[in-house]
Design a protein with these regions (language model features):
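N-terminal positively charged helical leader segments and presequences
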Residues: 1-90
Length: 91
């Protein structure tokens, strides 16, 4: 479980909220269950990592986490604090 909201990985994900970072890396951040569900279902080959809290992992196990795992995606469990730090919201 990722618990350090100041880690390099968390900073990298948070950086995707800025246009220059998205343009440089060619990556973007999808947030919310509907967007993530659709990305896993229809574009799993383009998903790099999936970050979920333990609560979200349980709530969306059947329609997001299990299909992501079956598609060979990296699913990382993170604390609520880490997810907030990754978000584009100023946490």
């Amino acid at each position: 479980m990722l618990t350090n909201p100041r880690s390099d990985r968390v900073r990298s994900v948070h950086g995707l909220g800025r246009r220059p970072v998205r343009e440089r890396t060619g990556r973007f951040l999808v947030e919310g269950p509907q967007g993530v569900r659709e990305a896993v279902r229809y574009a799993a080959d383009r998903v790099v990592d999936l970050y979920v809290t333990s609560t979200a992992a349980q709530r969306y196990a059947l329609d997001i986490v299990q299909p992501a795992t079956a598609a060979g995606l990296w699913v990382h469990e993170v604390s609520d604090e880490v997810l907030a730090a990754m978000s584009d919201a100023d946490a």
